[in-house]
Amino acid sequence: VRIVFGTDSDSALTRAVLDALEERGHEVKQVAAGEEWPEVGRAVARAVVSGEAERGVVCCWTGTGVTIAANKVAGARAALCTDAATAEGARRWNDANVLSFGLRLTSEDVAREMLDVFLSTEPDESERAAISRVEAQS
């Protein structure tokens, strides 16, 4: 899977996330390195919406800022997740295309669990009509 990754902080967790993605065989591109959260969120979302990447992963201290910025891009569906069940539901029921999380409270193990389910879960086709209504609002 082609993944675009962005963060406004270089930390042990962000490096572990990049390592986990690459270890799992994903093609990973990091964008907006060194930029602040508004640019990071937008850059990740634009890469996903344009088709440059299939999914995005974005993080900042709380995860809130990058999520808001990403969701300003038409066609982006960024979901701020705190655990694997939420990440799975975001894909299954909402067809989220960007996984967002905060660096403040997310452990490396939880980040890896969220990545695994977010990248392996497909949308539930019974939700397609609802997802289309959200897309029409863009």
Question: What is the role of each PLM region?
Answer:
Residues 17-18, 70:
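Hydrophobic residues within alpha-helices
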Residues 18-28, 75:
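Short helix-loop-beta junction
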Residues 4-6, 10-13, 17, 84-138:
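C-terminal binding/interaction regions
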Residues 39-42, 81-83:
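Charged helix-capping and loop-helix junction motifs
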Residues 40-69:
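Short, structured active-site "lid" loops
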Residues 27-38:
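A short beta-strand-loop structural module common to alpha/beta enzyme folds
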Residues 58-59, 64-104:
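Mid-chain, well-packed structural core segment of small domains
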